[in-house]
Amino acid sequence: MSGHSKFANIKHKKEKNDAKKGKIFTVIGREIVMAVKAGGPDPANNSKLRDVIAKAKANNMPNDTIDRGIKKAAGADSADSYEKAVYEGYGPNGVAIIVETLTDNKNRTAGNVRNAFTKGNGSIGTQGCVSFMFDQKGQIIIDKEELEDECGEMDADELMMTALDAGAEDFSEEEDSFEIITAPDDFSAVREALEKAGIPLVEAQIAMIPQTYVELTDDQAIKDLHRTLDLLD
């Protein structure tokens, strides 16, 4: 899910509660199923599966859970089947929102998404109504404290050069993290180069990145947006 508001854009949060983590694991589990069914269970021959495994590890999913998910998806009797469905709409004050889902029931999911927009005083729109405001990019987040713990003296310049040499498009520094942006086709190569260098990744995913951001100052609009995002999560 991508938000047109700066604070609504998904960023690293050091502490995730158990319910949030459970939802993330469920989504990643479905992504594992789709990746295995599309390209097989061997990560060495399935770049999409490698990307999903990296995402799982960045979210602290246990290795045995990852392995079980791959084996289950590869089983001949596996009945799990998910489809990707994308919804677009507007939150309060015209904030553009894209919702990406993996579902085994599109009708149910469409109703749930529509309900989330409505309860947050927003509205679901037609396909393409906001997607032109976003660019699909590879997004990698690195926590400064974790980088120092794992890589010692590596500074921002060295990290930036490692990323750019591997094919990254952009590198930016926040207060407590670094963000690396890649073209979708270069994402796997950049991620693998960073992992090979021993750099810990907090987030590694293909995401819809807003071209511009809006700032919400109205308290009610902020509450409505939080309500929408909470329901969508």
What spans do the regions from the language model cover?
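N-terminal cationic and glycine-rich segments that engage phosphates or anionic surfaces
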Residues: M1-G125, C129-D143
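Positively charged, low-complexity, intrinsically disordered RNA-binding extensions
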Residues: I141-D233
